[in-house]
Amino acid sequence: MANDVIEIEGKVKETLPNAMFQVELENGAVILAHVSGKIRKNFIRILPGDRVTVEMSPYDLTKGRITYRFR
């Protein structure tokens, strides 16, 4: 079950309250994403314009989890 994730790259468009972000994916779709625990634990800052990797569930393609921020 845990392997049913879709990984896709995107660009952070906007920062929202409660550590949520609007991310524009490579295919042009805009989704709502939150930060994964490891990024939060290591105090990695995510700003608008950053390129990120997002994990999405195949059941809800409007939400995701940011798992990596590119340098």
Swiss-Prot record:
Q: Which UniProt keywords apply?
A: Cytoplasm, Initiation factor, Protein biosynthesis, RNA-binding, rRNA-binding
Q: Which GO terms describe its cellular component?
A: cytosol
Could you tell me which SMART domains the record lists for this protein? Answer: S1 (SM00316)
Q: Cross-referenced Gene3D superfamilies, in alphabetical order? A: Nucleic acid-binding proteins (2.40.50.140)
What InterPro entries does the entry give? NA-bd_OB-fold, RNA-binding_domain_S1_IF1, S1_domain, TIF_IF1
| Segments forming domain S1-like | 1-71
Primary residence:
cytoplasm
Q: Which domain of life is it from?
A: Bacteria
For this protein, the record's PROSITE patterns field holds: S1_IF1_TYPE (PS50832)
Which molecular-function annotations from GO does this UniProt entry contain?
Answer: ribosome binding; rRNA binding; translation initiation factor activity
Name any one Pfam family assigned in the record: eIF-1a
Q: State its location(s).
A: Cytoplasm
Q: How does it assemble?
A: Component of the 30S ribosomal translation pre-initiation complex which assembles on the 30S ribosome in the order IF-2 and IF-3, IF-1 and N-formylmethionyl-tRNA(fMet); mRNA recruitment can occur at any time during PIC assembly.
PANTHER family the record matches: TRANSLATION INITIATION FACTOR IF-1, CHLOROPLASTIC
Role this protein plays: One of the essential components for the initiation of protein synthesis. Stabilizes the binding of IF-2 and IF-3 on the 30S subunit to which N-formylmethionyl-tRNA(fMet) subsequently binds. Helps modulate mRNA selection, yielding the 30S pre-initiation complex (PIC). Upon addition of the 50S ribosomal subunit IF-1, IF-2 and IF-3 are released leaving the mature 70S translation initiation complex.
Q: Which family does it belong to?
A: Belongs to the IF-1 family.
By what name is this protein known? Translation initiation factor IF-1
